[in-house]
Design a protein with these regions (language model features):
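Conserved N-terminal beta1-alpha1 strand-loop-helix module at the mouth
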Residues: 1-87, 91-95, 102-110, 122-130, ...
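Generic enzyme active-site microenvironment
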Residues: 32, 172-173
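Short glycine-rich anion-binding loops that position phosphate/pyrophosphate groups of nucleotides
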Residues: 138-140
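Glycine-rich beta-strand-to-loop/alpha-helix junction loops that act as flexible
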Residues: 173-176, 194-197
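Acidic, divalent-metal-coordinating active-site segment for phosphoryl/phosphodiester hydrolysis
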Residues: 176-188
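Catalytic cores of soluble, metal-dependent hydrolases
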Residues: 184, 193, 200-202
Length: 214
């Protein structure tokens, strides 16, 4: 499986509807929306009102990544805003199983995010509850960072865990993804790639998405 989820954090916020319509017409599979609270990560980005606006124009599923403290408090809010897929950080959840059950109870796909230096083995007892796992390949909070090379190893480790305990679980990678490392990530076992600057800073974003899926 080779899915592309362009990150709207790298879109032109002054022309967001235009960029969403471009993605609707492209071969991308999901739209990735980064929600940041200024506490769990230093930056602040989208909230529920912006997600709701994006949903009005998007024709692809919304892949909403919560980079916030205590994400379980906001599951219903983001369901109401239009999230189809909701991922929460392992590092931000005291009771991760409760949060995942809440996401599923609200009719969304649910997943766990691991920061670059959080070990894959920590998912051993929760992977069965995950529809996907998102591996951060940069430190979260800002777009345009350099890809962390150890990510390939983590993808392979996670793939082994998924095959052993939850073969239906998708592996998503977010951060520094480009045309050079995309095929290597798919080869390592990734199913979904989040691409920001590589798509939106290219001369032809739709063509870049097509190339990434090859």
């Amino acid at each position: 499986m080779k899915l592309i989820s362009p990150s709207l954090l790298s879109a032109d916020f002054g022309n967001l509807q235009r960029d969403i319509e471009m993605l609707n017409a492209s071969e991308c599979d999901w739209l990735h929306v980064d929600v940041m609270d200024g506490l769990f990560v230093p930056n602040i980005s989208f909230g529920q009102p912006i997600v709701k606006h994006i949903k009005r124009h998007a024709k692809k599923p919304l892949d909403v990544h919560l980079m916030i403290m205590d994400p379980g408090r906001y599951v219903e809010d983001f369901k109401n805003a239009g999230a189809d897929i909701l991922t929460v950080h392992y590092e931000a959840c005291t009771h991760l199983d409760r949060v995942l059950h809440s996401i599923h109870d609200h009719g969304m796909k649910g997943g766990v995010v691991l920061n670059p230096h959080t070990a894959v083995c920590l998912l051993e007892d929760i992977i069965q509850e995950c529809d996907l796992v998102l591996l951060m390949s940069v430190n979260p909070g800002f777009g345009g960072q350099k890809f962390i090379e150890n990510t390939y190893c983590k993808v392979r480790q996670l793939k082994e865990l998924c095959l052993r305990k939850n073969p239906e679980c998708l592996i998503e990678v977010d951060g520094g993804v480009n045309l050079q490392n995309a095929p290597l990530l798919f080869e390592a076992g990734a199913d979904v790639l989040v691409a920001g600057n590589a798509v939106f800073k290219s001369d032809d974003p739709a063509a870049t998405i097509h190339q990434m899926k090859q």
